[in-house]
Amino acid sequence: MLEKHLWRDFMAVTSSVAVLGLGVGSTLPLTALALTARGLGPQVVGWMAAAAAAGGMAGTLASPRATIRFGRRRVMLWCVAVAAASVIFLQYVDSLWGWTLLRAAFGVSMAPLFVIGEAWINSLPGDAVRGRVVAIYTTSFTLCQVLGPALTDAVAHAPHHAFLICGAVFLLGIPGIALARDPPAAAARAGYRATIGDKNAVASWLTIVRIAPAIVAGAALFAAFDNIMLSFLPLLALDHGFSQSRALAAVIVVFMGDATLQFAAGWLADRFGHARVHRTAGVGLCVLLPLLPLMIAVPGVWELYLFVLGGVAGSVYTLSMVSSGERFSGAALLRASGLIAFTWSLASSIGPAATGIVVQHFGGEAMTAVLWLMALGFVLAEHLGSRRPRAI
């Protein structure tokens, strides 16, 4: 699928970002459980997730310029160090204001890692295999993210070291990033201006939104899904009488479905068309989400439902990435990845905050209403984008 000399960069970046997935997957539920143990409600959990997302928006805006100036590898190494420190210090800070600042710093550091990593991966394959190559990347990330709640369950029994352990996990991403090859600064800047085939290399942020709204809507949908499931699904399961281990296992099943089904989604997209499969995933999510309150009471079917739900939701994000690589190159691809990350941060901020308020007033099952409205918005955006030309 890739030329031999590209596999080293692909494996290096993918392995590093996958390790970061483990850190993210453990930190979000650990934060939610720690706040709940202190007697704080879901609204505080939602705002804490929103603080990280708000920091992510700032980090996203800075990513393209920082990358062009300092290089991909150097920026990613700096960000890993800051992410690790922001998690470790949660162990020693008691005030909610301190936690809010640390979560914001976490968001600032994580956003460039995903912006740069995803643009890097998306620049490697040709369009004929892009769906499968990007799916390998997202699958690797999600498989490690799946292990996050399991790590949370393990470290929750050692509360005096829990955040220390989760913070140290991020440092495991450093070797892979250090091995990836970064071109000299002059060559990199020239590459960001280069046009490949009919792809847009100079599109502005606004132009990307105009000609490819499904990229933005897909990222927003899965960002909300990701954060809401990590933060609120365990709490919903606990409300239904699940043990802590079973509640966290529900999250694991969701992301196992996400990880397992991504290559299939990529293969289908390469074979039948990226836009068609993208749209089908959105419609499928609209059908599945309203069933969640019913399925939670049916053992066996509940786990199968979560598995399929995770796979369908994950394919929306994977194919948003594929679409950005299919349409854009150079600096425009970096901006498209930045826009995905910015949208992710914005949706991760608004989604959990809104969900926290909704859950506070209407109960845990109401979280599906927030996600269903976003899924409907994605389907409409995809339909709108399919009627517009590839370039403006």
Where in this protein do the model-derived segments appear?
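Symmetry-related core transmembrane helices of the 12-TM Major Facilitator Superfamily/SLC fold
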Residues: A162-A178, T368-H383
